[in-house]
Amino acid sequence: IDAAIKELNYIPNANARSLKSKQTYTIGLVIPDIVMYSSICYYIESQLYENGYNVIICNTNFDHIRENKSLNSLLERRVDGLILATSGQNEQLIKRFEKSGIPVVLFDRMQPTLKGNYILEKHEQCIVTMTEYLIENNHKNIAYIKGPKSSYVSEFRFGKFKEILKKNSID
């Protein structure tokens, strides 16, 4: 059999194998910006590869419609897991992953209404440290450029920023 496999250059069908094993050995990684998340993509892909998994990277360009299409495509492909930095507007679709038994890990974004695992930076500590640094250095006209209102993290950071300014009597 081994000689025939070698002679015919036989390549096993991954789809057929996944039907039997009930695993695709594929993880979906959905990110809003490939440039901003390139390092994280590299490390996630490297770790998954070392553990026998392939990664489908979906770059949504901060477009919730594109994110929706990417999530649907990953569901159709029966990925074994989903790692996601969500726009925050596809909650029902993400819940479909959970209902299907597909593990979901959300990173860099918080969706308080979703169960699951989160990997988050210390958003509160970061915004407090940055804002207090500016205030301690006597800056009074501090501008804040924030992300979309649909982003829980963006709104959380902005709320903390305003709270610190108010506490320091800065308009």
Spans of model-derived segments:
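Short, composition-biased local secondary-structure segments
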Residues: N13-N15, C41, T60-I65
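Short beta-strand segments enriched in small/hydrophobic residues
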Residues: L19-I40, Y133, N141-P148
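Bacterial carbohydrate/catabolite-sensing allosteric modules
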Residues: K6-N9, Y43-I56, K69-R78, E91, ...
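Functionally critical, cavity-lining and gating residues within the transmembrane helices
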Residues: P12, Y37, F158
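Conserved beta-strand edge residues that scaffold enzyme active sites
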Residues: L19, D33, F62, G88, ...
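Short beta->alpha connector loops
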Residues: Y10, D33-M36, N61-H64, A85-N90
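N-terminal helix-turn-helix DNA-binding module of bacterial transcription factors
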Residues: I1-Y25
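Intrinsically disordered, low-complexity polar regions and short flexible loop motifs
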Residues: L82
